[in-house]
């Protein structure tokens, strides 16, 4: 199947243009270094009120990953896990659910463990074929589908039901992860993600995001453009694997409101704010084209999903915060809790 025939190629090319503009533990103060566990395990827990800061050893990446968990309102009984993935920055900076929204406060009274992994900048949370000189070893698909879930279930005494959310680049990742491990997450919500990655325009989108912004090399991710791994990891091509998962998929139009103008100017006053607004408009317009193509593919397969196509909206956090609120009933349904 050639996605270029489906693709809003002009929109994706617009996105390409807009995107262009081991922790060592010492023993008893000595010099000996603890041997890391051979299997995935929590190596430390720091509790800060209801927030638990976990260090989870990943055998596939041979390093510890920080995973922050907001415990449920009532932790005396099992609760489901809501995985909330950040975007391209992967929570390593301040571009995160925690720092750019109030969703953690909003979720504080919900009977759910809110899972916030930190790390994986520029990786698309996938399994890279080779170590990258800049981004290192990336085996995030293995981590999220095989290593982390059983560790969390054991540590948190969770209910075994899960939901997964992602925005921007991780809006692509959550669909890939759901296809890699059908049934692990009962609900998946993708906000402003470009699902098609294997046609030339989609490849360019991924390439510019990972290479231009994060400094990695997508050849180390999926190989050259001719590699079949691009199609193997394309959520649109593999959409049949989403059957049976509750899906919430949203995108804006790229048309700004006055609040967008004010937001971008508050973040970067002057000409840079204008440039950033243009980027947010162009990227979101392209994302809408991707999302329409995903909808067409799911419709052709008879796979239901809940869609939110906003007539306005740029590629920025207030819209993703709104989308989380709007998708909450479906997320709660999948996790088996009251909405």
Regions inferred by a protein language model and the residue ranges of each:
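Non-catalytic cap/lid and distal C-terminal segments of serine-dependent acyl enzymes
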Residues: 2-3, 12-339
């Amino acid at each position: 199947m050639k996605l270029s025939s489906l693709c809003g190629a002009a929109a994706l090319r617009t996105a390409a243009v807009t995107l262009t503009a081991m922790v060592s533990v010492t023993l008893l103060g000595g010099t000996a270094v603890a041997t890391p566990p051979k299997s995935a395990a929590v190596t430390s827990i720091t509790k800060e009120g209801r927030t638990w800061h976990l260090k989870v050893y990943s055998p596939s990446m041979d390093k510890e990953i920080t995973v922050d968990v907001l415990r449920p309102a009532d932790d005396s009984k099992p609760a489901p896990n809501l995985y909330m993935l950040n975007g391209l920055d992967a929570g390593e900076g301040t571009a995160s659910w925690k720092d750019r929204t109030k969703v953690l406060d909003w979720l504080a009274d919900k009977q759910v463990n809110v899972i916030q992994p930190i790390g994986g900048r520029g990786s698309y949370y996938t399994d890279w074929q080779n170590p990258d000189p800049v981004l290192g070893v990336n085996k995030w698909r293995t981590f999220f589908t095989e290593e982390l879930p059983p560790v969390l279930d054991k540590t948190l005494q969770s209910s075994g039901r899960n939901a997964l959310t992602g925005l921007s680049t991780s809006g692509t990742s959550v669909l890939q992860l759901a296809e890699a491990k059908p049934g692990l997450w009962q609900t998946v919500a993708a906000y402003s993600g470009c699902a098609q990655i294997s046609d030339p325009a989609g490849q360019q989108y991924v390439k510019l995001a990972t290479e231009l912004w994060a400094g990695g090399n997508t050849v180390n991710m999926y190989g050259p453009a001719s590699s079949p791994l691009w199609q193997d990891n394309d959520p649109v091509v593999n959409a049949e694997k989403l059957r049976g998962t509750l899906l919430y998929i949203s995108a804006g139009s790229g048309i700004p409101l006055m609040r967008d103008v004010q937001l971008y100017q508050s973040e970067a006053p002057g000409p840079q704010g204008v440039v950033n607004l243009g980027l947010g408009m162009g990227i979101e317009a392209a994302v809408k084209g991707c999302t329409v193509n995903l909808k067409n593919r799911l419709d052709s397969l008879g796979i239901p999903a809940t869609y939110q196509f906003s007539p306005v909206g740029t590629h920025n956090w207030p819209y993703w915060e709104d989308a989380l609120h709007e998708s909450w009933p479906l997320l709660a349904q999948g996790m088996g809790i009251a909405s």
